[in-house]
Structures are given as C-alpha cells and as structure tokens.
Curated annotation (Swiss-Prot):
Amino-acid positions noted as binding adenosine in the UniProt annotation, renumbered to this chain: 7, 41, 68, 183, 234
Binding site residues for (R)-S-adenosyl-L-methionine: 183, 212, 226, 231, 234, 236
Enzyme Commission designation: 3.13.2.3
Gene Ontology molecular function terms on file: hydrolase activity
UniProt enzyme class: hydrolase
Name of the protein: (R)-S-adenosyl-L-methionine hydrolase
Length: 256
C-alpha cells in the first residue's frame, strides 16, 4: 500500500499526473489518497497529517509526502526505510511520523538513477511526479531504495523543532494542526490530565473534558482529542477563529 499526502490541491492535473506516473511504473500499486489539501507550503501541518496515518498503517506501508517549497534546490529527496517507509523531501516533513517508525536506514534518491526506471526527464519543479511518486511505486513493487539512491547517515536528516518547552509551570506550545472544524491541536502529549487549561495569552480558563458536547454550543474547552495531543475547541464552532491563531503560532499554557 502507498499513501499520498500533498499540498497540491485538486485543481489542475498535478495529483492525476503523479498517480498515473506511479501506476505506469507499478500497475498493481494500491494507492490511498490521504489528502492533497495540506495548507500550501506548511511542512509542519503535513508532518502532523503523515504522523496520524503512519500510526494506523500496517508494516511495509510506503508513505509518500510532498510538501516541498524547496523543490529544485539543493534539498535532498530521501527514503527512510524501516518497518514502514517514508518517501519525502528532506525538509522536516518526516519529523512527526518518525516517532512511530523503527528506522533501519536512510537513502538519498539520485535523480539519474531513478530516471533509468521511469524513462522520462525530471522536471525542476515537479518532483512529486518525477521522483517521489516513482520512488514509492518502485519500493512497493519490491525494488530496494539502494537501487536508485545512496545511503546517508540517519542523523543527517532535517527535523523540525516541535518539542514543547516548559518555563516554570507554563508550557510554551506550538499549534501543529487546525482541522476543518477549527479545532486547534497543540504539540503536547503524554501529559497528566488537568481539570482546567489556562491560555495565558488570552486570559482564558477552559474546562478539560473528554468530548465537545459536554459544554454548551459555542463554549470553548480543552480535551485530549483523537490524536493524543492537547486540543482546544469550541462546541459547534471554531477555536481557531475565536483565538485568531494559525499553524506554527506559539501559545503559553498552564495545566491546572
């Protein structure tokens, strides 16, 4: 199985081009579209999305992610080999999914080598179609990454700074995802459940509950959410709009 996560959107030929290129290489590939609606150029958001899919995928799954604002530059295209595979630009996209993969080795994809498998020229602006998609299709077909890449040190790959910080009793947390409901997901997991969550930047104290419907419509709350991260929400409303926050913003939070 191959999963696809991109910021291509659904307007235009890009997703279709990528998928037919993959099927040309591997006609029997089973391709799952996770989303093509990651906010444009948002590597952090894409990393979160890929993490959730990796957590529930079987061993051997190939995850292709293309949120690639550095396409055509010196940034590397890589394959991370483990109990699952990540095929991504080396720009930090692998950061969160890596928490759930037992990494064996990492390979830099060599364009000239992969072109021998595809048979077409590589565009400087569409590596999803010409490099990442084909690499994923080849792996799912049984071609080892060393056939089209070179091994590089595991600790050389780029990672985002997504670790929560604590200053006294205050957490400095980052917004790592906002879903279509406007729920705000923060980069804190494995915490002791509080009774109250204080958002210091907004002078708000929120009840910490298990689900949205435990407060009245329009009321704000904090909860564990379905992804094991601390979440801020409004019942039948948008916490992101209420707080005017976006992915990457930092919030000062106290758990009480």
């Amino acid at each position: 199985m191959i999963t696809l996560t991109t910021d291509f959107g659904l307007k235009g030929p890009y997703v279709g081009e990528m998928k037919v290129a993959m099927l040309r290489i591997n006609p029997n590939a089973k391709i799952v579209d996770v989303t093509h609606s990651v906010t444009r150029h948002s590597i952090l958001e894409g990393s979160f999305v890929m993490e959730q899919v990796v957590k529930y995928s079987p061993k051997g799954t190939v995850h292709v992610g293309v949120i690639d604002p550095g396409v055509g530059t010196e940034r590397r295209a890589i394959v991370i080999e483990g109990d699952q595979y990540l095929v991504v630009p080396d720009n930090g996209l692998a950061t969160l999914p890596l928490k759930h993969i037992k990494v064996k080795s990492v390979y830099e994809i060599i364009p000239d080598k992969i072109r021998k498998f595809t048979g077409w020229e590589i565009s400087s602006t569409f590596h999803g179609r010409d490099i990442f998609g084909p690499a994923g299709a080849l792996i799912e077909k049984g071609i080892h990454p060393e056939e089209f890449g070179r091994e590089i040190p595991v600790d050389s790959i780029v990672k985002l700074n997504v670790e929560p910080r604590k200053e006294g009793d205050v957490w400095i947390l980052k917004v790592i995802y906002i879903d279509d409901f406007g729920n705000v997901i923060l980069n804190l997991e494995n915490y002791e459940k509080p009774r109250t969550v204080e958002l210091l930047d907004f002078n708000l104290r929120l009840p910490y509950l298990e689900t949205y419907g435990l407060v009245e419509k329009g009321e704000m709350l904090a909860l564990p959410g379905s992804h094991d991260y601390l979440e801020i929400a409004v019942n039948m409303g948008s916490a992101a709009e209420r707080l005017n926050v976006k992915v990457g913003d930092e919030l000062r939070v106290r758990l009480l």
